[in-house]
């Protein structure tokens, strides 16, 4: 029996659970994931194999890095690119305004996940409830942002 951690680049359109199931079938090992990515998200999903599944609490609590793309002037009903546009237009902030604002996001704070998130409410993914017309209530959780860096800007 092999044990270890596989960092899988999960494609959009696949749930974290589906990714784990595929890896488990390919390896023949017990598998679990350390954290959940929303189905439409693309990103690294740490998959624990065999005896390494016991390390979940240690791996899941480690610091993570994200690369985000922001589109100013568009709002969707799901708060992500998968939703329907509910508003558009308005003033787009200058690069300097964005750079000046970044430090205000640093540190520890409480964050309430959006209704269309992979968080669970009574054992059901919030995005499933929201798609069925329910309004899931998600409890805020503590987040900590250690660093923010502007990488690039594209004007469309």
Residue ranges and their predicted role:
Residues 1-156:
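Catalytic/RNA-binding core of pseudouridine synthases
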């Amino acid at each position: 029996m092999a044990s270890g951690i596989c960092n899988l680049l999960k494609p959009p359109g696949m749930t974290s659970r589906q990714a784990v199931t595929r890896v488990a079938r390919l390896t023949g090992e017990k598998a679990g994931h350390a954290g959940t990515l929303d189905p439409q998200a693309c990103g690294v999903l740490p998959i624990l194999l065999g005896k390494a599944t016991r390390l979940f609490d240690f791996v899941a609590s480690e610091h993570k890095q994200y690369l985000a793309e922001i589109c100013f002037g568009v709002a969707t009903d799901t708060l992500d690119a998968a939703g329907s546009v509910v508003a558009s237009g308005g003033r787009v902030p200058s690069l300097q305004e964005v750079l000046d604002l970044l430090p205000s996001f640093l540190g520890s704070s409480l964050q309430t996940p959006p209704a269309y998130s992979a968080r669970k409410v009574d054992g059901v993914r919030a995005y499933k409830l929201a798609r069925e017309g329910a309004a899931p209530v998600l409890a805020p959780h503590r987040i900590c942002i250690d660093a923010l860096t502007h990488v690039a800007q594209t004007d469309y």
